[in-house]
Curated annotation (Swiss-Prot):
Expressed specifically in AFD sensory neurons. The chain crosses the membrane at residues 500-520. Guanylate cyclase involved in the production of the second messenger cGMP. Regulates thermotaxis responses in AFD sensory neurons. May regulate AFD neuronal activity such as calcium responses to temperature gradients. Residues 1-18 form the signal peptide. This is Receptor-type guanylate cyclase gcy-18. It is found in: Cell membrane; Cell projection, Cilium. Mg(2+) 2 binds at D923, I924, D967. Residues 918-1048 form the Guanylate cyclase domain. It comes from Caenorhabditis elegans. Residues 853-884 form a coiled coil. Keywords: Cell membrane, Cell projection, cGMP biosynthesis, Coiled coil, Glycoprotein, GTP-binding, Lyase, Magnesium, Membrane, Metal-binding, Nucleotide-binding, Receptor, Signal, Transmembrane, Transmembrane helix. The keyword S-adenosyl-L-methionine does not apply. Residues 521-1113 are cytoplasmic. GO terms for molecular function: ATP binding; GTP binding; guanylate cyclase activity; metal ion binding; peptide receptor activity; protein kinase activity.
Length: 1113
């Protein structure tokens, strides 16, 4: 009904309009003609004599909440700025539309005819703007659009009173995109779009502007509106793009979703290198969408962002800057609103709405200043003309960010020559390596003088582009890509003959080099295969420690020495029965053997001496590891012997060990090998005949060179369990000072440490130094340093080679003077004055005289050990028997003797049902009261004394105590050993003896108090058995247990209560006891039961006296 009325008003209540053509002078002095409509309207005057101008605002249902409040805040700001309030006043009438078809038209008619508004702000919906604008033109009132508007309303010859404050529309962003193309001289482009009216309209606008500016569209591909990345790739159109263009403009109806699919497709098709540039005009339907690589939870989707590599987004200057949100929120908070009151995603809508009212106020103020004529205030075209080329500061001031400091931010509003907001755009480069997009250029509008937008149908502005970043493109020199590659899209413009020729020549030279290399390596490998020390992994059979132990058996007679645990952990068998130990080194690349290496290894293989451990060979260049193999010695190393506290070493051992080491060194120094190079205690092995054999000789220097070349890793061997390595961390202690210094000096100079410059004599002098350290360890079973020396710290101290520590003899009292002098000579810092190995051998043989072999000495020691072992076995056997007796006694106290014997024999004790047995329960009366007035220790002492007496009563009457829990005491007879009918008699005697025992028992800490108890027993069938594995318990089960407990609990202090069954059993088999019937008693779980008191034994005066005493109490 309302809509009908409004349309009647439109067609039948139209005021008389005078039409007049008048010239107007713009700010730049140029004349501009327009048609002026006089609607004859008069303004209302309020009580304060202010002219009231009504403004109609047409919003949208469900969009931009609290938009009316924003307009009121804008109005308050205008009053503060003095634009409104002195002589005029704005009255804003807000209505909502967009919910039904053309509802905004009806709302506009209502606002004009009913409320007599003199200006429109809105409508928000683009579908209703065209119709409402035509009506406003007809009525000659200004209309200001603050949302994204369609291109159809751009013609000012039709829409004569329309001003647009929105900062981004299809026309403006098309102008910015084309300006960017011209800036980078991209005159050949392709367009990727989709079907649908929205995309068609956008493409049409872009094509028109490109044609005007001379940009050629070389290819246009169109996808379905609901397509995805897979369909785009399968369509084959991406290949057409790659064959015809390098600059691609993405114009989709849904910019966010379809561009995401398109960029994923180009990424998959490998169209994401530096030759391609993808320009995405960021056209949005209304609200400010999140970028595609930001998820709903605000987290970045790195994989999606990677797809946008080499993409350029054209958007307004604050498109990726959220600082405007905080500035706007801060302004509205001053007027009582909160951030939650607005839709932040549509922040631009609020900013444009705010600025729309200010634009109208500035135009009104300008009209009043010029004419002070009310007729001009209500003249829509006159006011619209004053909006042209107007510039003012909007709701948000100029951005203060680093990238926006030279650009007009969204707060600066510049209207062009047709009263449209002049665009301010930026181009943003998306870098996968940065969290935020990078602003590359700013595009700010500059008005063109001497230009009439009504005549040439343009805004009379040009975009000025300022470069912010350069050299950022992922090309070799950082320059932007060309619109057409130098060699063409398919490489057809370039000849590659020279490149192909040079490349072929290079490939040929590489192939020749590779052939020569492999030929050389083949010959080298053949030569290595012929070496006597070469061993292949396939010839090795690796064995574990259990297999080694079985192979090391030496017979039935064993001693402490023969059972020494050796440090050699890695064992293998070569061929059939050659037992070896090996050192494993991680190999990172093939080892290159020089001539000196092969000669040395051959000499080591050929070396034969009684005191040298045979070098069996090396396995290398296989399975990423190198193995150095030596013959296995079953007795371990000297280090194992020295630091084993169970081994007693006398002078014979000292002499034999030192003699063998000197003989081995003497042979090495006289052989082609020349020296040992790494003498340590773990390199001195002992075979099954107790002869010392030197190992790891000569190999240390090649290993160190191979490590420096990066072929092997010796550090891995240092950290292993194998203590017989040639390069342990502590081996540095045994090295001569000059060798350490030389090694570090060479390392600092970057020289190859081949030791070639070291003379043979100096290397032999280094062996003498190491021998002195080893001999000291043999004699004193310690290193020649103070007892509090930390070996790890000492190793670190010596590691850099710039510091040395001189060894010292710590115990000179038991050392022969000749050996004292010899050790000092061996440790001399001057290698020239150290003795030769021959002199060392002669001196040691004179002092450490050894007759015979160590085997004879070992046989004597074994005999002594066997004698001592017999005595030790006898002593230990006696101790074991005593322990077994004590254990048996303790076990029989915890469990019945029969059960304990069964468990000791390893047999399980099966549960058993006893047809007749008697169970007794006793309880201390007032136990809680006694405990409350006693300490825990006093309670324990009291119970211990009481239960000790009870235990004697049980033992005397052949009963068995089952358990005690606190003050409760449980006794049984007839279990586990059955005793026919005697169990009731035993229990009766036990109860009477316990009662008799209490007559003389005094509480230790309360001598004046007497302990009183209740007793109760019952006769019946009982099940018994051992329960539990840990702390097994002998437990009783059955109704007899429960009835016995009830006999105790329902009894009287000092009295012994029995069940009717127990009474019948005693009367039938043991009439010596006197009993008295108590009567019927209510028993829990049994109902009414007939019970009896056990009073005495016939002829027992003591128990009678006890009963009299109890009755007296």
């Amino acid at each position: 009904m309302l809509k009908t009325l409004l349309f009647i008003l439109i067609f039948f209540n139209i005021p008389i309009i005078a039409i007049e053509e008048i010239p107007d002078i713009k700010e730049n002095g140029e004349k501009s003609s327009y048609t002026q409509f006089d609607n004859g309207a008069k303004l209302e005057v309020n009580k304060e004599h202010k002219r009231v101008i009504k403004i109609g605002h047409i919003g949208a249902v469900g969009v931009m909440p609290n938009d009316a409040r924003i307009l009121n805040i804008s109005k308050e700001n205008l009053i503060e700025e003095g634009l409104v309030g002195d002589d005029i006043e704005f009255e804003i009438v807000s209505r909502q539309a967009c919910s039904e078809s053309f509802e905004g038209v009806a709302v506009a008619a209502e606002l004009y005819h009913v409320h007599q508004v003199r200006a429109f702000i809105g409508p928000y919906c683009a579908a209703e703007l065209e119709a409402v604008t035509k009506m406003a033109t007809f009525w000659n009132i200004p209309i200001i659009s603050y949302s994204s508007v369609p291109n159809a309303v751009s013609d000012r010859s039709v829409y004569k009173t329309l001003a647009r404050v929105s900062s981004k529309n299809t026309n403006s962003i098309a102008e910015a995109t084309v300006a960017l193309l011209l800036h980078y001289k991209w005159l050949k482009v392709a367009i990727a779009t989709n079907t649908g009216s929205t995309a068609f309209e956008r493409v049409s606008i872009f094509e028109e502007i490109m044609h005007r500016e001379g940009v050629t569209i070389v290819k246009k591909v169109m996808f379905d509106e609901n397509t995805d990345a897979n369909e785009m790739m399968n369509s084959g159109q991406l290949g057409d793009l790659a064959a015809n263009a390098r600059i691609i403009i993405c114009l989709f109806s849904s910019t966010k979703e379809l561009s995401k699919e398109f960029m994923q497709a180009t990424y998959t098709m490998r169209m994401n290198n530096a030759e391609y540039a993808y320009i995405i005009p960021w056209l949005q339907s209304g609200t400010k969408d999140l970028t595609p690589w930001i998820g709903a939870d605000g987290e970045m989707l790195q994989r999606v962002k990677d797809h946008y590599a080499n993409a350029i987004i054209v958007d307004d200057v604050n498109g990726f800057d959220d600082s405007v949100v905080s500035s706007f929120v801060e302004k509205i908070e001053k007027h009582g609103m909160q951030k939650s009151d607005i839709d932040v995603t549509n922040i631009n809508g609020y900013l444009h709405l705010f600025d729309s009212l200010k634009l109208y106020a500035l135009a009104i103020r300008k009209v009043l200043n010029e004419t002070d004529n009310e007729a001009y205030v209500t003249n829509g075209q006159f006011i619209w003309n004053r909006m042209r080329r107007m510039k003012f500061e909007g709701v948000v001031s100029r951005s203060s960010s680093e990238e926006n400091k030279d650009a007009g931010a969204i707060g600066t509003v510049l209207m062009d020559d047709v009263a449209d907001r002049a665009p301010i755009f930026s181009a943003f480069y998306i870098s996968p390596n940065r969290d935020k997009v990078m602003k590359m250029v700013n595009m700010e509008s500059e008005l063109i003088s001497n230009c009439d937008g009504l005549k040439n149908k343009s805004g009379c502005f040009q975009l000025k582009i300022n470069d912010i970043k350069s050299g950022f493109w992922p090309s070799e020199d950082g320059s932007m890509p060309l619109d057409e590659p130098i060699c063409g899209y398919r490489g057809q413009r370039c000849s590659y003959l020279l490149e192909i020729s040079v490349g072929s020549l290079i490939i040929l030279l590489i192939l020749i080099s590779v052939v020569f290399f492999f030929l050389f390596r083949y010959c080298e490998n053949k030569q290595l295969e012929k070496m006597p020390w070469r061993i292949f992994h396939d010839d090795l059979q690796f064995i574990d420690e259990e297999q080694v132990k079985s192979m090391m058996s030496v017979g039935s007679v064993t001693t402490k020495l023969s059972n020494i645990q050796t440090g050699q952990k890695q064992h293998a068998i070569i061929g059939v029965n050659t037992h070896t130990t090996y050192h494993r080194y991680k190999q990172r690349r093939p080892i290159k053997f020089i001539k000196e290496d092969m000669q040395l290894l051959t000499q080591m293989k050929q070396a034969v001496h009684d005191n040298l451990n045979p070098f069996l060979g090396a396995a290398f260049n296989e399975k990423e590891e190198m193995l150095v193999l030596w013959k296995f010695c079953s007795r371990g190393t000297i280090q194992d012997i020295i630091y084993n506290a169970n081994v007693v070493l006398d002078e014979k051992f000292h002499g034999a060990f030192v003699r063998d080491i000197t003989l081995g060194l003497e042979y090495l120094h006289a052989s082609p090998i020349g020296y040992h190079g790494s003498l340590t205690p773990w390199c001195c092995l002992i075979d099954r005949n107790w002869m010392v054999k030197l190992s790891d000789y000569g190999i240390a220097n090649p290993l160190e060179r191979w490590e420096k070349q990066g072929a092997i890793e010796i550090a891995a061997a240092k950290d292993s369990d194998d203590k017989s390595q040639a390069s342990q961390a502590t081996s540095i202690i045994y090295m001569a000072p000059e060798l350490l210094k030389n090694r570090e000096t060479n390392k600092r100079r970057g020289m190859d440490q081949s030791w070639v410059k070291q003379s043979m004599l100096r290397r032999q002098a280094g062996d003498i130094y190491s021998f002195g350290m080893v001999m000291y360890e043999i004699l004193f079973r310690s290193l020649p340093f103070r007892d509090n020396t930390n070996i790890s710290e000492l190793v670190d101290y010596l590691a850099d080679g710039s510091k040395t520590v001189s060894p010292e003899i710590q115990n000179q009292m038991g050392l022969h003077p000749d050996l004292n002098a010899l050790l000092r000579d061996c440790w001399s810092e001057n290698p020239e004055i150290r003795p030769s190995i021959r002199r060392v051998r002669l001196n040691t043989e004179m002092v450490l005289k050894t007759k015979g072999s160590l085997v004879d000495q070992m046989m004597k020691m074994m005999e002594q050990y066997a004698n001592n072992l017999e005595k030790l076995v006898a002593e230990r056997t006696g101790m074991l028997e005593e322990a077994n007796i004590r254990a048996d006694q303790l076990l029989t106290q915890l469990l019945p003797a029969y059960v304990a014997n069964e468990l000791k024999m390893g047999r399980s004790v099966a549960p058993k049902l006893y047809s007749s047995a008697t169970i007794l329960f006793s309880d201390i009366v007032g136990f809680t009261t006694i405990c409350s007035g006693s300490t825990p220790l006093e309670v324990v002492n009291m119970l211990n004394g009481l239960y000790t007496g009870f235990d004697e009563c049980i033992t005397r009457n052949k009963s068995y105590k089952v358990e005690t829990i606190g003050d409760a005491y449980m006794v049984v007879s007839g279990i586990p050993e059955e005793n026919e009918y005697n169990h009731s008699r035993n229990i009766a005697n036990t109860a009477l003896d316990m009662r008799q025992y209490l007559t003389g028992y005094q509480i230790p800490h309360r001598p004046t108090h007497r302990v009183r108890c209740r007793w109760g027993f019952h006769t019946g069938s009982v099940a018994a058995g051992v329960v539990g594995l840990t702390c097994p318990r002998y437990c009783l089960f059955g109704d007899t247990v429960n009835v016995s407990s009830r006999m105790e609990s329902t009894g009287t202090p000092g009295m012994i209560q029995m069940s009717e069954e127990a009474h019948m059993h005693i009367r039938a088999h043991h009439p010596v006891f006197t009993t008295t019937e108590r009567g019927e008693v209510q028993v829990k779980g049994k109902g009414t039961c007939r019970t009896f008191w056990l009073e005495d034994r016939v002829g027992d005066a003591s128990t009678t006296n006890y009963i009299q005493n109890v009755e007296g109490v």
